[in-house]
Structures are given as C-alpha cells and as structure tokens.
C-alpha cells in the first residue's frame, strides 16, 4: 500500500482470508468456494491484475492468465500443482503478457 499497490490475494480457507485481510490485503478470495479469476475481474472493474505472483503453477497458470490485465506480468516462484501447464500462446501475444519466474535462490556476482 505504501507504493499505491492494491493487493488481492487468494487463500484456501476462510481463516486464511481473514488473516490476509488483517495483514493489509485489499481483498482476499477463498479459491475453494469462489471462482477467483471472476472475482479478480470484478474487483478490478474488468481490467484484471497488473501483476500475478504465482506460487501454485500447473493447472492454475491458465486461470491466472485469464485474470491478468492486458500488458500484465505473471511471475512464477513455485510449482506446487506441477511444473507443466497448457496455455494459448496466441492469447499471450495478443494481450502482450509477460511471463517470467524465479527460484528465489541467490546468484553469484559473476552471474
């Protein structure tokens, strides 16, 4: 919030939703009881999220991309649901999406 970022999070339980809101999330969605992609679209007035930090991977990738704004950035940092996903590359190109990732491990200065 300090930088003007509105953080929308997804959680697997109502208790985690409450905790995320207590920690300062602008909105929290229980992905077990709601269609998180539709909720993100609704919360952003149909625009979608500018950045998605994905710790799930696998079959969640297409759903994450569906709630990403045009020119949005998807950042993968874990693969709890698997390391492979099917996606429509034409959609990625048409909407000018950026897909990137990190293992969050340190690198040498020479890298």
Please identify what each model-predicted range represents.
Residues 3, 11, 20, 59-111:
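Glycine-rich phosphate-binding loop and adjacent beta-alpha segment
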